[in-house]
Amino acid sequence: MLLYTKELVIPRPRPGLLRFRNNPRGIKFREKLCNSFAHSNIHGMQHVFGEQHLWQRCLWLAIVLGAVITGFSLYTVLMHRHSEQLLVSLIETTQLPVYHIDFPAVAVCPWNHFNWQRAPSAFIRFLPRHPNAELRETFRQLLASMDIMNFSNFNRIRILTKRNLTGISYLKMTDLMNFMTYRCDELFVADSCVFDETPYDCCKLFVREQTVKGQCLVFNSMISENSRKKHLINQFYPHKLSTAGEDSGLKFTINASYSFMNNIDALTPFGMNLMIKEPRQWSNEMMYHLYPDTENFVAVHPLVTETSPNTYEMSPKKRRCYFDDEKNPTFQNTSLTYNRENCLVVCLHLVVWKTCQCSLPAFLPPIDGVPECGINDAQCLGNNSDIFTYVKMGDQEKYINDSRQGHFCDCPDNCNSRLYEMSLNVRKLDYPKNSTDQLIKAQVYYGQRVMTKIITKLKYTNIDLLANFGGIISLYIGASVMSFIELLFVLGKLMWGFIRDARIKLKEYTK
């Protein structure tokens, strides 16, 4: 009979409840972490937690940490490049039809503003009854000074300060200029105006407007009240044009006869300033001179520049331009559309107001509530003409040693603007035999049917940042969106287990 000892049999449990050894909670959490990442699809992590040997796990951990640090270092560089907000200008097209924009406004400004045939009527209209010889001579010198005056030569009117101005101190320059300046029918030859190969009455095409050169006759503008009325009754105003070349745009002829126009004592010959500007632009410093007995051909090559809306979050100072719905602090209390030229004239008018405590609506956009400069203000205007006629821009003093006086205007461009490149060809005008006329002929037309459009936009957008971030993470970590979702799921699962164990432990502790 075999004898079984207690060493050969399975020990029987003691009576009562069985007791199991509790594993430490830290070990349990670590096991869950290892188990989760050992079966994870996140590159490298399965090796960190799944390899048998310690040195292999350390090696893979160093590789994973190095890849993560390198990837996020490059991402930091990428973020810095994105935060710089670099702008790039690209040619969007060179074949944009010219009818996409308005035909430019064309202003004709005489060198001598006044028709001296109306001088006797001006004496009767503006002087008191029975003026003495001194007052008549003072008024005549005033007319002679204003005849050749524009905003760049106020010092000409300063000579009047040596005379007694008491008798004419009440006069307003605007009223006097409106009475004495040329009428449309006095300048243009009848039936000489043609636009888009269609004849027009010149006085229906051209309207009187104020510019920095004084009162001019302007075609296709939106500045004056009469011009804006045209837009209300004609949806196609300002005019557009689809053709190019000579005889396709605007043609007009000016009567340059001296018999009734010029002042006898004037030293300035008769001539015209031709100004090409945007329809909603007050004035333009770039002008051409039109001389009698010449035929002038002005070819306009427009260039359209636009700024992408993705730059809207940038500050105008960094963008260096303003959108239409943004306000420049120096461009206020005006109904003009914002562009650089309009900003400059508004800024200039504010300088005149602060310097001489009056305004000049005859040359600059009006300022509500500010009195108009009178004859008594001529000395202030003349003494400060060097300030008014020179504009200092930006930080030019860092680069230019300029001791001249002037005024400072911060006027960036409009983010969506146009630039007109022009070329002028002049030839001598041939008259019919025995003709005694003196004429100035001019044509303004597009040089080509198409134009170039340049668009400025951010070089690196949020989409570029996201795409480059995805490329860096894929290259160094081999991760994707699904990898991040899986990582968040694993961490969330572990966090939930940790919270649940903590709650159980808290309940056991409170019992």
Curated annotation (Swiss-Prot):
Primary localization class, coarse: membrane
Reported function: Part of a complex that plays a role in tracheal liquid clearance. In both larvae and adults, contributes to the behavioral response to salt. Probable role in sodium transport.
Entry similarity comment: Belongs to the amiloride-sensitive sodium channel (TC 1.A.6) family.
A GO molecular-function descriptor: sodium channel activity
Keyword Transport: yes
InterPro entries reported in the protein's UniProt record: ENaC
Localization, UniProt: Membrane
Membrane-protein topology: Multi-pass membrane protein
Classification lineage: Eukaryota, Metazoa, Ecdysozoa, Arthropoda, Hexapoda
One CC-aspect GO term: plasma membrane
Gene name of this polypeptide: ppk19
Transmembrane segments: 59-79, 471-491
GO annotation terms (biological process): detection of chemical stimulus involved in sensory perception of pain; detection of mechanical stimulus involved in sensory perception of pain; liquid clearance, open tracheal system; response to salt stress; salt aversion; sensory perception of salty taste; sodium ion transmembrane transport
Protein name as it appears in the record: Pickpocket protein 19
Pfam families: ASC (PF00858)
Tissue: Expressed in the tracheal system. Expressed in the taste-sensing terminal organ of the larval head. In adults, expressed in hairs on the tibia, femur and wing margin, but not in hairs on the tarsi of the leg.
Sorted UniProt keywords: Ion channel, Ion transport, Membrane, Sodium, Sodium channel, Sodium transport, Transmembrane, Transmembrane helix, Transport
